[in-house]
Amino acid sequence: MTHVDTAGSGTATRWGRAAVVLITMSVFGPYLAGGIRTEQVAVYGAAVLLCALGLWSRVSLTTAGGVVVALHLAVVGVATIGVVFPPLNPTLHSVGSLTGGYDSLLLPLAVVLVLAMLVGSGANPAALLRSVCIVTVWAMAANTVVAIYSISSNSTTVLALFRLFGEGESVADRAERMGRYSGIFNQPAEAGLLYSVALLAAIYLYRDHIPKFTVSVAALTIGGTLSVSKIFLLVGAPIALAQILLVPGRRRRMWSLALTAVSVGLLTQLDVLERWDGRDFLLRLLPGAGQGDQVTLYTAGRFGEHSSLNEVVGAAFDISPMTGAGVRGLQLPYDNGWVEALVIAGVIGVVLHTALLAALFVGWLHGRSARPESVLAGGLVLAVVGASFGLPAITANRCATIVWLLLGLLLVVARPAAATTWWQRPGEGRHRVPPAVAPRLVGAGRRP
């Protein structure tokens, strides 16, 4: 991407970096008064402020980004039908919160809007992307420290400020009784997705810096393992391992893997980790170690015999199969992106959700190049699609904001007056470069 080296451009980049750093850090903040999350204040506040400054007129999206935003808006529209014309609810399940439902759907749009206004005003998207990645990597590394500390101490009172506003037992509290420690996150699945995203970001940032690579990847691997999240173990970690193995340079690749393995091994010898009671739960996931249906085991009962999703799917079809129960949803755990779409927007929502994920993949496929950003984007899309089988990855609290910050900068937001991603080199045909899984693509160090 070509930037005019002017004071205005530099100023826009500095303010843009400050904005995305603030938003990224807010994801790891506590609940505030009235059950409001820190990230809600940061994202909506930034969107309102930038719109008030008139930057809304500078918004520019890629072709794929325009399709993604249109599909997401269509989901919002279909889900709103259930608000304007509430369907009969013959089930025994109560509807959810109207504000909570709209927040889940509108927050991703607000994140994309903020990014588009920042880039449209002259901020360098490469600098913004790097800032988001740095904060995400080291914040999740810090979350690993919190998770380790939780093993040997009773930190429930403090962590409740981050996990669940108000009284009651959180999902994380119940998970910890099984030895699954997710730090500040309310669900191991949320932690697993963000550890996966942070791992991909660490590879992108430190692929040529072995010390930082080793420390960050080791910390993130331990944190993801302590959460015993299938999203991390079965989706994020394999994708990250594949990218590490494809780093060019045999010696550098072997050093990176060896140092990371040694670091993980040494850290697991800490006295506190030796007392980790989730080891048995983790070992059950090894092939042949678990009893009963392996599909049920690997998906935590979401799929396989006696699927936990059957009740939710049945309730959605009983209420309104085509348009769903509306944006309020039902007070049931969805545990799946497509199931959430079915509940709030019916079969139409499922089709739109699938099309949105496909649009992200096609957007990456058409814009892939020999740049490391292409590898990050491809891994991120695969992680989001895989994670969607275990939670609503593009709308879930906290992790959705990080996901859309990265997806927005990589695939959705365009250069001013352009319809392509900023990291796609002009003049290079999309079919002249093989898919971004070839070894030489991962290590391409050219910067915009």
Where are these regions (language model features)?
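Interfacial loop-to-transmembrane-helix boundary motif in multi-pass membrane proteins
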Residues: 15-19, 67-75, 115-162
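N-terminal hydrophobic segments of proteins, predominantly signal-anchor/transmembrane helices
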Residues: 15-31, 47-116, 382-388
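Loop-to-helix entry and N-terminal half of a specific, functionally important transmembrane alpha helix
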Residues: 18-26, 364-391, 402, 409-411
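Alpha-helical transmembrane segments of multi-pass inner-membrane proteins
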Residues: 130-161, 173-177, 182-228, 233-245
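A membrane-periplasm/extracellular boundary helix in multi-pass inner-membrane enzymes
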Residues: 152-154, 247-293, 315
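Hydrophobic transmembrane alpha-helices and their immediate junctions
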Residues: 209-210, 237, 241-244, 250, ...
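Long extracytoplasmic/lumenal interhelical loops at the membrane interface
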Residues: 281-283, 289-348, 364-369
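Transmembrane alpha-helices of multi-pass inner-membrane enzymes
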Residues: 379-387, 393-443, 448
